């Protein structure tokens, strides 16, 4: 497993991480998750992989989550986890075993999942009933963006790299502005994915200083020991954050 930090725009503190499954083969080197996850699905091994990811992520991150009650761990899910009635109870029992607050776990639902909206809505409500936070991931890549925003019960929005990249171009940036106004009006914390350049960072900071950033501009994903060193080096104090920041509509600037 590797973990990519999520950064608060206003003070550059690391407020959480996203758990990312990785495989480094001795012969073939680094294998793309798209490749080995597809193989696991074909071999009917994905259920084991799913539970391995949950258990390994929570177990590795437990010391940090226990020490910092506002630090968050994001776990990606797919169709299997949504349809598996045992997944959420298992995850809840897991965090209970480590004395972790359920709201420190962010379950990330991507718009690429092709399931009926009613099924997604039911899962979202069940996840929140266990105390987990729900993240609408990859916003802007699906075909039902607006419907998801109005029908699903979620706590965070993750803006996809495709929108972040548009900030580099004046013409495209004018189209992104109204979308950002919409997201802000929902009064939900926004995480910008795939931030890779100084320009992208500066525009986000100027217009959405209450938001969060995840991307190579700050950090790539890293193994747990490297993350430990990073947090120690930066003298991380996530306790200064009283939960996620939500936008102040009066301070909104149109990009």
Region spans (language model):
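Catalytic core of bacterial c-di-GMP phosphodiesterases, primarily the EAL and HD-GYP domains
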Residues: 13-17, 45-119, 194
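Conserved long alpha-helical elements within nucleotide-processing catalytic cores of c-di-GMP signaling
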Residues: 34-38, 47, 125, 173
């Amino acid at each position: 497993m590797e973990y990519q930090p999520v950064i608060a725009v206003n003070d550059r503190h690391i407020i959480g991480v996203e758990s990312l499954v990785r495989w480094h083969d001795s012969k073939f080197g680094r294998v793309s998750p798209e490749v080995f996850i597809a193989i696991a699905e074909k071999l009917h091994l994905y259920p084991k992989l799913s539970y391995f990811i949950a258990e390994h992520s929570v177990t590795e991150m437990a010391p940090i989550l226990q020490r910092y009650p506002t630090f968050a761990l994001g776990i990606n899910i797919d169709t299997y986890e949504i349809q598996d009635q045992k997944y959420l109870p298992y995850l809840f029992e897991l965090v209970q075993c480590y004395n972790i607050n359920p709201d420190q776990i962010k379950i990330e639902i991507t718009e690429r999942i092709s399931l009926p909206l009613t099924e997604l809505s039911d899962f979202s409500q069940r996840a929140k009933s266990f105390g987990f936070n729900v993240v609408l991931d990859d916003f802007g890549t699906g075909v039902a963006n607006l419907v998801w925003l109005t029908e699903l019960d979620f706590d965070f929005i993750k803006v996809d790299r495709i929108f972040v990249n548009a900030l580099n171009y004046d013409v495209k940036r004018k189209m992104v502005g109204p979308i950002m106004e919409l997201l802000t009006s929902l009064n939900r914390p926004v995480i910008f994915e795939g931030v890779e350049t100084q320009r992208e960072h500066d525009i986000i900071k100027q217009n959405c200083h209450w938001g969060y950033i995840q991307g190579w501009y700050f950090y790539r994903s890293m193994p747990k020991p490297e993350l430990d060193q990073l947090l120690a080096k930066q003298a991380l104090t996530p306790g200064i954050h009283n939960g996620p920041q939500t936008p102040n509509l009066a301070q909104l600037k149109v990009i």
